[in-house]
């Protein structure tokens, strides 16, 4: 795998969790997985790591006749948890204040930085001498690696039969390379032009198979509304594009063993959850007489925080309490503060990133809010189910694939609901659904059955990992079919 993030080594969002968990899940299925990751500032190779000096030829300037420049770096082979971590150590590229930029601006040489990651990954894999079955890239940062595979290194024996996969975690992020820096990629680009090179688009076009992180988002992404400007590219891939829902690591997210919680619990004995609820309310000055709505994430309109800010006053009037943990948009933060200031016993606003506090909210809240405008997969709703906190979500992306409205009519053979769902991204739709949840919370027997039903569901990585196995097999089958068809066309031309 080629990725820019991997938990616990480098993380800005859910991508890191997916890369780590999927690599471990594939290892548990008997595969030998390597993860290539930049050695960012502050990332120390784990104990037992092996240092390997490498020299990679990189472009020294624009123009096809410009000679390449030997570039020295170090590859660290690190023992991982079920997979091998390979850190690409090149301080001029990766020893920086941020992963992708700083002060709100991307680094202008991001294309060159992640092209280096891709070139090193391919060179190291080829040098191993063992045939590489699959090159699996994640998001635009893997675009250069996939471009390189499409433009030549298959002459190396170890890469000759390698199939390539691109997983698109969020189509809103593209990785634009300015035109004056396009030469730094050292690769031909389909999308090169006055606007530069779009690394996401390049990766989509270069990979044997492309997937995104839920079936519904895969369908949504074929439209201009959700496709992030690459909907036509995705439609062009046809049967080579699909959605595979993310899982969660149920060994890391387990209320029965979570050390961040005041009390642990499971679906058979929920008394610990009530302890956690009362503790959460007490520590943040909330009146625990009403249901607690929890929300954790990046303060951004994509996540629906503007809907919550607009609906919050009415939500309190209905009898709800609200606790929000997250950082982000300053305007949204101030709107939430405007609601919180006069209601200190009903609203807690935690303007920070705090992993342990997030766990306590997942455990202590009654209802977990995810009113996203779009949500490629979503992790919060799965953690909430695991912790017995009922999700209230907007029907989009992975939320639509995982949360079933408890009040929706059910035909014979369908699975009972596990949460509350609304359709339209409006404060009114959110409030209408919140009122249903508030009413449901008062029926304690039915509510506890709903809680236990959610906790019993399996959203681990074992199922998704097998779907990725199938994706790899399908990529190889389609590659073989394409090769046979190409050979047959060549025979026809030769015989004409």
Regions found by a protein language model. Name each.
Residues 1-496:
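Catalytic cores of nucleotide-sugar-dependent glycosyltransferases that transfer UDP/GDP/TDP-activated
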